[in-house]
């Protein structure tokens, strides 16, 4: 079974558009991007198109590559204090000269649509309500909507990034999966992944997951976005793994669209909460 993130995301965005209209909301998302990385600018454009689609206003602050941390912090302070801005997103990765942790921590937790503020990460760890990181949240929605059983299953996450690997492991744990995390120092990776009922790869390395690493019938979630010979591909060797997996996400068209949908939902939720219309 192909887990169609593109189709599901489109349906969820249409429902969100209706909710925004019926709720009389007028959410506004501010994005901050630093530098000229083509991929980052492409992702920001996609997010703004989604905003337009569902009725969320958006503003983009584009800063040059040589911008200082202090300058970014000042722009974030202004956005924090702006009553018309509901959500703030800083497009990652930032240039190496920027203190990314300081930048993310400067965003007001109640305007943090990405869920990366330390307070919101703490809420994720403890299971308290709060905005969840968009890619992991999108993955969980994709699994739930496709009736993929999680409770009691063995889940393996390849990759320990703060934005995907660690939070998806926590969300799976909260859903009562038995979770194992793997990373660049993990020994016997194949032996571990082959035990997984649910295998999530967020390693950022094209083709790292091959058919001999996958348990027959497993659900395989490919978070990778890699460029190989000018073509977008994931971490999973799709053609061979699809033959033995019970369910698998394609790249493109799997996790990516769900990430965008989750961002839009987070923005609308934050706008509701700031207006006092708690869900």
UniProtKB/Swiss-Prot annotation:
PROSITE patterns found in the cross-reference section: THF_DHG_CYH_2
Domain of life: Archaea
Example GO BP: tetrahydrofolate interconversion
Transmembrane segments: none
List of residues binding NADP(+): 159-161, 184, 225
GO molecular function, one term: methylenetetrahydrofolate dehydrogenase (NADP+) activity
Gene Ontology terms: cellular component: cytosol
Disulfide bonds: none
Keywords: Amino-acid biosynthesis, Histidine biosynthesis, Hydrolase, Methionine biosynthesis, Multifunctional enzyme, NADP, One-carbon metabolism, Oxidoreductase, Purine biosynthesis
EC number(s) on file: 1.5.1.5, 3.5.4.9
Pathway involvement of the protein, from the record: One-carbon metabolism; tetrahydrofolate interconversion
PANTHER family listed in its UniProt record: C-1-TETRAHYDROFOLATE SYNTHASE, CYTOPLASMIC, C-1-TETRAHYDROFOLATE SYNTHASE, CYTOPLASMIC-RELATED
Subunit text: Homodimer.
Similarity annotation: Belongs to the tetrahydrofolate dehydrogenase/cyclohydrolase family.
Function (record text): Catalyzes the oxidation of 5,10-methylenetetrahydrofolate to 5,10-methenyltetrahydrofolate and then the hydrolysis of 5,10-methenyltetrahydrofolate to 10-formyltetrahydrofolate.
Family annotation (HAMAP family): THF_DHG_CYH (MF_01576)
Name the UniProt record assigns to this protein: Bifunctional protein FolD
Organism: Methanospirillum hungatei JF-1 (strain ATCC 27890 / DSM 864 / NBRC 100397 / JF-1)
């Amino acid at each position: 079974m192909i887990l169609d993130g593109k189709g599901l995301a489109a349906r969820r965005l249409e429902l969100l558009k209706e909710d925004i209209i019926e709720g009389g909301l007028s959410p506004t998302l501010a994005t901050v991007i630093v530098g000229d990385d083509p991929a980052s600018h492409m992702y920001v454009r996609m997010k703004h198109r989604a905003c337009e689609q569902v009725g969320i206003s958006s503003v983009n602050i584009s800063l040059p590559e040589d911008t200082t941390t202090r300058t970014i912090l000042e722009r974030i302070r202004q956005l924090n204090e702006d009553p018309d801005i509901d959500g703030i997103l800083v497009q990652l990765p930032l240039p190496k000269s920027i203190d990314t942790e300081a930048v993310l921590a400067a965003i007001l937790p109640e305007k943090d649509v990405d869920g990366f503020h330390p307070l919101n990460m703490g809420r994720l760890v403890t299971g308290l309500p709060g905005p969840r990181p968009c890619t992991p949240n999108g993955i969980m929605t994709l699994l739930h909507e496709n009736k993929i059983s999680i409770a009691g299953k063995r889940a393996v996450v390849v990759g320990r990034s703060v934005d995907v690997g660690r939070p998806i492991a926590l969300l799976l744990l909260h859903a009562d999966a038995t979770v194992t995390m793997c990373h660049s120092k993990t020994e016997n990776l194949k032996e571990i992944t082959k035990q997984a009922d649910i295998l999530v790869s967020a390693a950022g390395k094209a083709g790292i997951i091959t058919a001999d690493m996958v348990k027959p019938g497993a659900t395989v979630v490919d978070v990778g976005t890699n460029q190989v010979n000018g073509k977008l591909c994931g971490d999973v060797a799709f053609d061979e793994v699809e033959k033995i997996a019970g369910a698998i996400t394609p790249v493109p068209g799997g996790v990516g669209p769900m990430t965008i949908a989750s961002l839009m939902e987070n923005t609308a939720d934050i706008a509701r909460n700031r207006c006092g219309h708690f869900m």
